[in-house]
Protein backbone atom coordinates (compact mmCIF):
# COMPACT_ATOMS: atom_id res chain seq x y z
CA UNK A 1 0.00 0.00 0.00
CA UNK A 2 2.79 2.44 0.90
CA UNK A 3 4.57 1.63 -2.35
CA UNK A 4 1.43 2.40 -4.36
CA UNK A 5 1.02 5.76 -2.58
CA UNK A 6 4.68 6.57 -3.19
CA UNK A 7 4.42 5.73 -6.90
CA UNK A 8 1.21 7.74 -7.23
CA UNK A 9 2.83 10.72 -5.47
CA UNK A 10 5.83 10.62 -7.79
CA UNK A 11 3.52 10.46 -10.82
CA UNK A 12 1.51 13.48 -9.62
CA UNK A 13 4.69 15.47 -8.97
CA UNK A 14 6.06 14.63 -12.43
CA UNK A 15 2.87 15.82 -14.15
CA UNK A 16 2.73 19.00 -12.05
CA UNK A 17 6.39 19.75 -12.77
CA UNK A 18 5.84 19.40 -16.52
CA UNK A 19 2.82 21.73 -16.40
CA UNK A 20 4.75 24.36 -14.44
CA UNK A 21 7.68 24.18 -16.87
CA UNK A 22 5.38 24.71 -19.88
CA UNK A 23 3.72 27.69 -18.18
CA UNK A 24 7.12 29.20 -17.30
CA UNK A 25 8.28 28.98 -20.93
CA UNK A 26 5.09 30.65 -22.20
CA UNK A 27 5.38 33.38 -19.56
CA UNK A 28 9.02 34.12 -20.46
CA UNK A 29 8.17 34.51 -24.15
CA UNK A 30 5.20 36.78 -23.38
CA UNK A 31 7.28 38.98 -21.08
CA UNK A 32 10.08 39.24 -23.64
CA UNK A 33 7.66 40.21 -26.41
CA UNK A 34 5.99 42.80 -24.20
CA UNK A 35 9.31 44.29 -23.07
CA UNK A 36 10.87 44.53 -26.54
CA UNK A 37 7.80 45.25 -28.69
CA UNK A 38 8.04 41.71 -30.07
CA UNK A 39 11.72 42.20 -30.90
CA UNK A 40 11.04 44.56 -33.79
CA UNK A 41 14.01 46.69 -34.79
CA UNK A 42 11.95 49.71 -35.80
CA UNK A 43 12.23 53.38 -34.84
CA UNK A 44 10.52 54.06 -31.54
CA UNK A 45 7.21 55.88 -31.54
CA UNK A 46 5.42 57.71 -28.77
CA UNK A 47 3.33 54.61 -28.09
CA UNK A 48 3.48 50.98 -29.12
CA UNK A 49 0.68 48.44 -29.26
CA UNK A 50 2.53 46.15 -26.88
CA UNK A 51 2.94 48.84 -24.22
CA UNK A 52 -0.72 49.21 -23.33
CA UNK A 53 -2.49 52.48 -22.61
CA UNK A 54 -0.04 53.88 -20.04
CA UNK A 55 3.24 52.62 -21.46
CA UNK A 56 5.58 54.42 -23.81
CA UNK A 57 7.82 52.88 -26.41
CA UNK A 58 11.34 54.11 -25.75
CA UNK A 59 14.73 53.26 -27.13
CA UNK A 60 17.32 51.36 -25.12
CA UNK A 61 20.68 49.84 -25.95
CA UNK A 62 20.45 46.05 -25.80
CA UNK A 63 23.19 43.66 -24.74
CA UNK A 64 23.73 42.99 -28.48
CA UNK A 65 24.81 46.60 -28.98
CA UNK A 66 21.66 47.46 -30.94
CA UNK A 67 18.99 49.97 -30.05
CA UNK A 68 15.62 48.38 -29.45
CA UNK A 69 12.21 49.70 -28.56
CA UNK A 70 11.12 48.82 -25.05
CA UNK A 71 7.98 49.61 -23.11
CA UNK A 72 8.51 52.08 -20.30
CA UNK A 73 6.28 53.51 -17.64
CA UNK A 74 7.78 56.16 -15.46
CA UNK A 75 9.85 59.30 -15.73
CA UNK A 76 8.44 61.38 -18.58
CA UNK A 77 11.62 63.39 -19.24
CA UNK A 78 13.92 60.39 -19.35
CA UNK A 79 11.55 58.64 -21.75
CA UNK A 80 11.43 61.62 -24.11
CA UNK A 81 15.23 62.02 -24.00
CA UNK A 82 15.63 58.40 -25.04
CA UNK A 83 13.10 58.82 -27.84
CA UNK A 84 14.97 61.84 -29.19
CA UNK A 85 18.38 60.14 -29.09
CA UNK A 86 17.04 57.01 -30.79
CA UNK A 87 15.69 58.87 -33.82
CA UNK A 88 19.10 60.29 -34.77
Curated annotation (Swiss-Prot):
GO cellular component, one term: extracellular region
UniProt note on tissues of expression: Expressed by the venom gland.
Main location: secreted
Full protein name: U2-ctenitoxin-Pn1a
UniProt keyword Secreted present: yes
Protein family according to the UniProt entry: Belongs to the neurotoxin 03 (Tx2) family. 04 subfamily.
Function recorded in the entry: Inhibits voltage-gated sodium channels (Nav). Causes scratching, lacrimation, hypersalivation, sweating and agitation followed by spastic paralysis of the anterior and posterior extremities and death at dose levels of 1.62 mg/mouse. Insecticidal to the larval and adult forms of the house fly.
Presence of keyword Secreted: yes
Amino acid sequence: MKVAILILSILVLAVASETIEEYRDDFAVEELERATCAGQDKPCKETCDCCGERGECVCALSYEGKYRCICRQGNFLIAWHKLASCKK
